[in-house]
């Protein structure tokens, strides 16, 4: 661990070296943006629990770790290493290793005419005008130190452009792989997704880690939804237990848009998932759906900020948490209804299961309403597995592990049922299946003779 002063000096040295060689260092506007962002980070520093948006989460484990940029580390993966992360039915998968595009393992299947799926560094070099039109336009680096840090160290990530009136039927999968090193390492992937009016598409961000070691992935995604677009965004976090992950999704919605955000948090030591849609055009709809499952000493923080900035918009937030061991979860959901956003219809719900006496959840649904003709509700619940339900299943001849799995899956399926993209849902269900099996199998009430090996069967087969 190092002091705050030592950490700042380390970042100053890293930034000085980085900006000399970074992609786009010869573009005055980008150089100025990076410098302004780094100055802002130096000014505000890492957040503390005195900051209202971070009151439940202590990030000192990140702030006091001497991370070095992963840009000088490993950037290649063998096909064998990547095989566990291939997804059936997905023909377009960009692979990023330690924040940089790995071209060889990436897949670019046939896409509709005009659709562009590439990396940010390439776009900065070959088409800076299109990149400048949206990059950093919607993110508020004044409020968020991690977003400022990401902007300062922006170099690579995904760039996706969907032309007007285009339907992309297959999901566009973005796989981010962090690899361990002798020293703690950090990467700052930056993604820019622009969907023009009347287009439809699905995007997946998938975070994994290899090799062990302390890694930190600090990601920002800007998603621009043009008028009348229908978009789905999935974020899957399944890194190892020495990994830190801060992920920020900033969504800018135009008129009559329908945008869905799904988040599934399964791994990591400390994870912060920020989702911030702004309904900037009349008649927009937004659904934020999430599931977080923690065990051991995991810390999983979900911060949702939905801004209703125009009339006749609706939003829904549904988040479920399952926590065991000493895991700690956070749900902080804010809905802000601006003065002119009349006829707003907004709802947020957070439901949680605590499976041990040491598991914790902090939940704070929050409404800020500055208009007078609105319909807004919010609520949160915290509970445990019902003994009567478990007894009923056991009395029907279902073994204890399977009975617990069925009850946990029924709770998790509330979120799964909102995932409509076939290959993505099937993949996520498999991940949750394995995660909940381990959780049910290791429950304190399960006798040794009843503990079982994972059969790999689906939930329908178990039931």
Residue ranges and their predicted role:
Residues 1-148, 318, 323-324:
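N-terminal amphipathic, basic helical "cap/leader" segment at the start of enzyme domains
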Residues 104, 113-398, 412-448, 452-454, ...:
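Conserved beta-strand/loop scaffold segments within soluble protein domains that form the structured core
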């Amino acid at each position: 661990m190092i002091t705050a002063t030592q950490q700042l000096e380390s970042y100053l040295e890293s930034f000085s070296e980085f900006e000399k060689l970074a992609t786009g260092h010869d573009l005055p506007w980008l150089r100025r943006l990076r410098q302004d962002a780094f100055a802002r980070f130096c000014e505000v520093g890492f957040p503390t629990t005195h900051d209202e948006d971070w009151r439940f989460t202590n990030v000192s484990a990140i702030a006091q770790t001497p991370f070095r940029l992963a840009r000088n580390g490993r950037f290649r993966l063998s096909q064998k290493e990547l095989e566990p992360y291939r997804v059936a039915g997905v023909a377009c998968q960009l692979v990023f290793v330690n924040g940089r595009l790995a071209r060889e393992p990436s897949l670019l299947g046939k896409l509709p005419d005009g659709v562009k799926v590439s990396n940010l560094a390439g776009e900065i070099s070959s088409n800076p005008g299109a990149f400048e039109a949206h990059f950093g336009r919607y993110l508020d680096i004044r409020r968020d130190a991690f977003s400022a840090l990401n902007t300062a160290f922006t170099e690579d990530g995904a760039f996706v452009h969907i032309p007007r009136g285009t339907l992309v039927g297959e999901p566009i999968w973005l796989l981010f792989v962090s690899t361990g090193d002798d020293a703690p390492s950090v990467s700052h992937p930056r993604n820019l997704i622009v969907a023009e009016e009347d287009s439809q598409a699905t995007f997946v961000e998938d975070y994994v880690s290899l090799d062990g070691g302390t890694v930190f992935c600090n990601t920002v995604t800007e998603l621009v939804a043009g008028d009348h677009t229908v978009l789905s965004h999935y974020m899957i976090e399944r890194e190892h237990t020495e990994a830190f992950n801060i992920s920020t999704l900033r969504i800018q919605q135009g008129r009559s848009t329908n945008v869905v955000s799904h988040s599934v948090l399964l791994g990591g030591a400390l994870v912060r998932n920020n989702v911030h849609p702004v309904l900037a055009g009349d008649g927009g709809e937004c659904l934020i759906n999430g599931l977080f499952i923690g065990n051991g000493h995991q810390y999983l923080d979900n911060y949702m900020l939905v801004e209703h900035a125009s009339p006749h918009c609706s939003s829904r937030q549904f988040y479920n948490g399952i926590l065991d061991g000493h895991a700690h979860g956070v749900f902080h959901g804010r809905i802000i209804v601006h003065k002119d956003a009349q006829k707003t219809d907004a709802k947020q719900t957070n439901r949680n299961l605590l499976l041990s006496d040491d598991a914790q959840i902090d939940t704070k649904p929050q409404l800020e309403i500055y208009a007078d003709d609105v319909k807004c509700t919010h609520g949160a619940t915290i509970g445990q597995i019902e003994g009567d339900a478990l007894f009923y299943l056991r009395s029907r001849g279902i073994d204890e592990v399977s009975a617990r799995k069925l009850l946990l899956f029924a709770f998790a399926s509330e979120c799964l049922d909102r995932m409509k993209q076939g290959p993505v849902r099937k993949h996520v269900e498999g991940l949750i299946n394995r995660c909940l099996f381990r959780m049910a199998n290791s429950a304190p009430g399960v006798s040794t003779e009843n503990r079982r090996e994972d059969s790999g069967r689906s939930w329908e087969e178990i039931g």
